[in-house]
Amino acid sequence: MNKITLLSVAVAAFTFLFTATSSAGSVTGKEYQAVIDTAYNYFNGAANGDQKLLLEAFDLEFGHVKMISVNKETGKETIRTVPLKEFAGYFKKATKDTWSANILSVDIVDDKMAMVKLDFDTPKTHYIDYLVMYKRENGWRIINKTFVAKKKQ
């Protein structure tokens, strides 16, 4: 393959990639900030015991949390499911610890569904959350929160 053909292939590939990225961004870009805000409403609501923020983040009608837990009697791992309405109630008071969160990835599909990967750190535990959201009539709401937690030494 000569240099001109190689350059043409490279330019065509770059143009295709740039066009695909630009198109995808314009389709979901207007919703990106709303999805980010919903994820941080959850995080800030939990950290600050702010039920109003949690209500803005969670779909209390259909939402659930799934988590790995260990059965105290058998010692076996199990998957526990808790309605988001109940889960929100766990955060009635602000934490005295410093919590931090970083969004690792956002995937938005047709401005109707989104998934956010959230790196969530507290002094005692490190979490990775996957937040699945639907855009409802009242905005973006978390309908499924799945996470793993690792206790720190």
Feature-to-residue mapping (PLM):
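Surface-exposed, charged secondary-structure patches
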Residues: 76-125
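A mature extracytoplasmic/lumenal domain signature
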Residues: 58-61, 69, 119-122, 131-132, ...
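Bacterial N-terminal signal peptides that target proteins for export
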Residues: 1-10
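Short beta-strand edge/turn micro-motifs at domain boundaries
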Residues: 126-153
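Hydrophobic h-region of N-terminal signal peptides that target proteins for export
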Residues: 12-20
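Short, low-complexity N-terminal intrinsically disordered segments enriched in polar/charged residues
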Residues: 5, 19-52, 56, 60
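A short gly/proline-enriched turn/hairpin at secondary-structure junctions
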Residues: 64-77
